[in-house]
Amino acid sequence: MKKILFVLTLGLAMVLTSCGDQHKAQSLVKDFLNENLENEDCSFKRFSQLTPTAMIDFNRVKSMRQEMNQLPYMKKNIDYNDGTFPDTLMYLRATYQLTTHDGKKEELTQTFYLDKALTRIIAFKEN
């Protein structure tokens, strides 16, 4: 009986922790976009599950940053609060609706790469 209770408690703790990380990652992405969109009028539609990846290297991050610096609806020279490049990144896809300067609505899906501690956005790309 004690083993069953232990396993159930451990499972519940894991579920609550992963939900907390998902929420923290979503909040980080929302804050990043609110700070770096030229026009802050966006509404979020959905987020993917937070997932780890080791497939992105520093050169790919630099390339993504240069590409995203060209987007007309993003501020130029975004500050990514650079620190040590992590071995493993976490990624999250966000779909949101952006209202452009001329009032048109545009739906965008982007992938955001975060550090494992979920304290900063490392890079992002359009899908």
Roles of regions detected by a PLM:
Residues 19-127:
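Cystatin/cathelin-like cysteine-protease inhibitor module
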Residues 1-18:
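Sec-dependent bacterial lipoprotein signal peptides
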